[in-house]
Curated annotation (Swiss-Prot):
One of its GO terms (cellular component) is cytoplasm. It is an enzyme of class 2 (transferase). This is Dual-specificity RNA methyltransferase RlmN. NCBIfam families: rRNA_mod_RlmN. Keywords: 4Fe-4S, Cytoplasm, Disulfide bond, Iron, Iron-sulfur, Metal-binding, Methyltransferase, rRNA processing, S-adenosyl-L-methionine, Transferase, tRNA processing. One of its GO terms (biological process) is tRNA methylation. It comes from Desulfotalea psychrophila (strain LSv54 / DSM 12343). Binds 1 [4Fe-4S] cluster. The cluster is coordinated with 3 cysteines and an exchangeable S-adenosyl-L-methionine. The active site is at E100 (proton acceptor), C350 (s-methylcysteine intermediate). PROSITE patterns: RADICAL_SAM. HAMAP family: RNA_methyltr_RlmN. GO terms for molecular function: 4 iron, 4 sulfur cluster binding; metal ion binding; rRNA (adenine(2503)-C2-)-methyltransferase activity; rRNA binding; tRNA (adenine(37)-C2)-methyltransferase activity; tRNA binding. Reaction proceeds by a ping-pong mechanism involving intermediate methylation of a conserved cysteine residue.
Length: 362
C-alpha cells in the first residue's frame, strides 16, 4: 500500500546516487527496496528522458519520483574533431562552467578521458588545467554523464566514421582535476559505471590517475576495483617540488611507499606516468634512478613526450633521448611504453585541457 509522502522542497538528481543509495531513496519514499534497483535499471538507458517512460513503475510512484527528483543529461556538447580521430567534448554545466572530455578511438577500443573537477588545485607547472585554478568538484552525475554523452555520440556516429567499436570500452580519470581530491564523488561514479544496471563497465577497464594524494590512495584501492595510475614525472624531490607542488605535502619516498602497500589484485600493476621534459627529467642518470626507486612495486611505465602548450616554458626531448631513457628501464626488466600523443591539433592531448573561457582570463 502506498504511504503518504511529504514532497521534498528541493529535488535531487538521481544520477548522483549509487544503486544502494537509490534503494535508500526508494525506501524513504515508502517503497520496497527493489524499486531502487528498478530505477537504476532505467536511469542509464539512452532513450529514457522522463519518469513516464519507466513503465514497470506504478503511475503513482512515477508521479512521486517526479515531485521529489529528476535525472540529468548532457545535451548539445561542443564537439571538436582532431585529424587523428580524437574527439573533444565541451560540456556546459548547470552553473555555466565548462568541462572537457576526450574520446580516444583505436581499432579495438574507445578510451574516454573524463574530468573530475572544474579546474584543478594542484598547480602542476607543465599542465594547462593547473593554470586554471580550482573552481569546484564535479558531482557523480556530472562525472557519469560524460560517459553517457560519449556513449550516445558513438551510437549515433555513422559506421564509416567509426575507428573503433560503437561504444565506450575504457574510462580513464585523467581529464581536468585531481580525482583523489574528489574521492567521495569519484567512488560513487565508479560504482555507477561498474554496476550492471548502470553502465556495466568492468573495473579492469577503468583507471584513476593521481598526482600523489597519499592520504586517499588506500581507500581507493579498498573500495574500487579499478586500475591506479601515478603521475610521477621526476625521480628526486627537488625536481618534483618544482614541477608538482603536491610533492611538498607528500614527498616522493612517501608516495612510493604508499604504492608498495597499495591494495590491488594479484595480476594488477600500477601505471607510472612520466612526462619527458627536455633537460629537466630526461637524462640517463634519472632513468637509472627511476629503475632503482620503483623496485618491489608491480608496475609498468608510460613515457609521455611533452605536449607543448602556449605560455609554458617546457620542451619535449627528441625521440632519440626518449628511446635511450626507455632502453635503460627495459634493461632493468620494466615494461615501458612511449605514449603516442593524440588530439594535439584540438588541444586535447595530455596536459592541454583548459576551457577557452578560463584561458582567456588567465
Amino acid at each position: 500500500m502506498q504511504e503518504e509522502i511529504t514532497t521534498n522542497r528541493e529535488k535531487i538528481d538521481l544520477k548522483n546516487l549509487s544503486q544502494d543509495q537509490l534503494v535508500e531513496f526508494a525506501e524513504k519514499l515508502g517503497q520496497p527496496a527493489f524499486r531502487g534497483r528498478q530505477i537504476m535499471s532505467w536511469l542509464y538507458r539512452p532513450e529514457v528522458r522522463d519518469f513516464e517512460q519507466m513503465t514497470d513503475l506504478a503511475k503513482v510512484f512515477r508521479k512521486l519520483l517526479a515531485e521529489n527528483s529528476f535525472f540529468s543529461h548532457f545535451d548539445d556538447p561542443i564537439i571538436e574533431r582532431a585529424k587523428d580521430g580524437c574527439v573533444k567534448f565541451g560540456f556546459r554545466l548547470h552553473d555555466g562552467h565548462v568541462i572537457e572530455t576526450v574520446l580516444i578511438p583505436e581499432p579495438d577500443r574507445n578510451t574516454l578521458c573524463i574530468s573530475s573537477q572544474v579546474g584543478c588545485a594542484m598547480k602542476c607547472t607543465f599542465c594547462m588545467t593547473g593554470g586554471m585554478g580550482f573552481t569546484r568538484n564535479l558531482t557523480p552525475s556530472e562525472i557519469v554523464n560524460q560517459v553517457c554523452a560519449a556513449r550516445d555520440f558513438l551510437a549515433n556516429e555513422p559506421a564509416d566514421k567509426l575507428i573503433g567499436p560503437d561504444r565506450v570500452t575504457n574510462v580513464v580519470y585523467m581529464g581536468m582535476g585531481e580525482p583523489l581530491n574528489n574521492l567521495e564523488n569519484v567512488l560513487t561514479s565508479i560504482s555507477i559505471l561498474t554496476e550492471q544496471k548502470g553502465l556495466d563497465l568492468t573495473g579492469r577497464r577503468i583507471t584513476v590517475s593521481t598526482c600523489g594524494i597519499v592520504a586517499n590512495m588506500a581507500r581507493l584501492g579498498q573500495e574500487a576495483p579499478v586500475n591506479l595510475a601515478i603521475s610521477l614525472h621526476a625521480v628526486d624531490d627537488k625536481t618534483r617540488d618544482m614541477l608538482m607542488p603536491v610533492n611538498n605535502r607528500y614527498p616522493l619516498d612517501e608516495l612510493l611507499e604508499a604504492c608498495r602497500t597499495y591494495p590491488m589484485g594479484k595480476r594488477r600493476r600500477i601505471m607510472f606516468e612520466y612526462i619527458m621534459l627536455a633537460g629537466i627529467n630526461d637524462s640517463d642518470t634519472e632513468a637509472r634512478t627511476l629503475a632503482r626507486k620503483l623496485q618491489e612495486i608491480p608496475c609498468k611505465i608510460n613515457l609521455i613526450p611533452y605536449n607543448e602548450s602556449p605560455g609554458l616554458p617546457y620542451k619535449s626531448p627528441g625521440m632519440k633521448r626518449i628511446l635511450s631513457f626507455q632502453n635503460i628501464l627495459r634493461e632493468a626488466n620494466y615494461s615501458v611504453f612511449i605514449r603516442n600523443s593524440r588530439g594535439e591539433d584540438i588541444a586535447a592531448a595530455c596536459g592541454q585541457l583548459a576551457t577557452d573561457e578560463t584561458t582567456k582570463q588567465s
